[in-house]
Amino acid sequence: MTIKFASLILAGLGLGSGALGSVTFRREESSWTNDSLTSVFAQQAKGLFLPRTVISFQGQEWFENVTERWDIYAPPTFKVSVSPSTEKDVESAVKLAAKFKIPFLATGGRHGYGTTLGKLKNGLSIDLSLLNQFSIDSKAATITVGPGVRFRDIFTPLYEAGFQVPTGTCSCVGMIGATLGGGIGRLNGLDGLMIDALESARVVTADGRTLTVSEKENKDLFWGMRGAGQNFGVVVSATYKLKPLYAAGVWTNVDLIFSPDKNATYFDVVTSMEVPPQLTIASVVTYNATLDEPQLIATLTWTGPRDEALAAMKPILDVGPRHSEVTEATYATLPRVATFGTTDAVCAPGQIYDIYGVGLRRLDSAAWRSTFSKMARFYAAEPAGRASSILYETWPVQATVAVPDDATAYPWRDASTYVLIQMRWDRPGSPLERAADRLGAELRSDLSATGGYQGAGPAVYVNYAHGDERLEDIYGARKLPRLAKLKKQYDPGNVFRFHHALPTKYP
């Protein structure tokens, strides 16, 4: 049986993931004026696209909706947007941009971040939100999604069909965009990374061809797409292998708030725990405006019933939270109830997030306690920065490390915690920006120093990268020679370069 869905979005706001592919040509990004780009599309696009494909310009409502981003720190800027309604129209948009040497970024949901995206100025947006169809094939146990599909679109249909698939935790993120960097989340211990579920994809490459990549077709490119995919093309569809619901789709969510004096004990417990595949721990250093003090929020999830969950979580519960909420959920409802049901607030677009990330193989309680203390001092000194936070995602790794390291381009399979440092302030151009950015980089360095990876820099999940990292920090030195060869083969002109670009030669 095949179940098909198509929730057509006419004015998408905060639609999901980061850039699926970015292409630039031999003209300087800033050399295009509004009039020249408008002229190209007014004259050349006639009859090129199907009627449902939308061309929009700066100042128009559609344009503003489909170029609005979740993070407005160092964002790309655009003069024109094309919203293709078919795969063929994606190809046409790429070819038109190539012909006139127009730099562009293809986006599935605009949830991506990183300062390298901001190098695109006054370019073309290829908005993929209309390609939001997906189909579940129950017999084959697969789901095929378009680049406009977000995580929240698939949870209920999959649950009702009796399946699950690895996803991230933020429900508004685009599925394909998150996959290309690796795809971490709550099912990493049971089912592995999102790239481990990826069965095949259709990719528009730098020369305008659409290729199918899988273990049987274009296998070399398929390897590179799984961990560094933003460097090789625009993904117009992807098929994932599904697993039957674990524990009949029953989940238990426990949200906790700890007072600041508990941070040392809490971190001691979390960093010393053996995390079974059913358990996930998300720890957030944040600020409590009501009590005027820093605090720790923990979201613990368990794939199974309440009694099992509370037994597995007992070491953390024994630390003594000042507030707790236990919710019995399902695979479909968990993303909406987790972290006190704050998913809508977290997904609100148009906010400043200066993000630094680091992956940890070794968990050092002293380093974590130090980051709490530094954030507490920052909160006290900079009231305008109190929306800043540190998120520690401690995911189980059993299924992730069961996949051989050389099976995909992803370099950090044995990372047991991913840290997302989110420095925030109230408005662009704030004098707080320099101090906040400096602290973000410092915290990343502190955690990297005890994180268990060898090398001169941090081990950084590409989807959490800031933009100042070395290539080795993001892609891993052992992966780069093969990735560089693929880059030379499929994109020798380095046209896909706005998302932590790969070289065509390494070393």
From Swiss-Prot:
Signal sequence interval, chain numbering: 1-21
Q: Any idea which GO molecular function terms this record carries?
A: FAD binding; oxidoreductase activity
List the induction conditions: Expression is increased in rice-extract medium (REM) and is correlated with the production of pyriculol.
Going by the UniProt annotation, this protein carries glycans at: 34, 65, 263, 288
The UniProt record lists the FAD-binding PCMH-type domain at 73-245
Q: What UniProt keywords apply to this chain's record, in alphabetical order?
A: FAD, Flavoprotein, Glycoprotein, Oxidoreductase, Signal
Catalytic activities: dihydropyriculol + A = pyriculol + AH2; dihydropyriculariol + A = pyriculariol + AH2
What cofactors are annotated for this protein? Answer: FAD
PROSITE patterns membership: FAD_PCMH
- SS bond list: none
Q: Which SUPFAM superfamilies match?
A: FAD-binding/transporter-associated domain-like (SSF56176)
- Stated EC number for the protein is 1.-.-.-
**What top-level class of enzyme does the UniProt entry assign?**
oxidoreductase
- Similarity-based family: Belongs to the oxygen-dependent FAD-linked oxidoreductase family.
Q: What is this protein called?
A: FAD-linked oxidoreductase OXR1
Organism this protein belongs to: Pyricularia oryzae (strain 70-15 / ATCC MYA-4617 / FGSC 8958) (Rice blast fungus)
Taxonomic lineage from the root: Eukaryota, Fungi, Dikarya, Ascomycota, Pezizomycotina
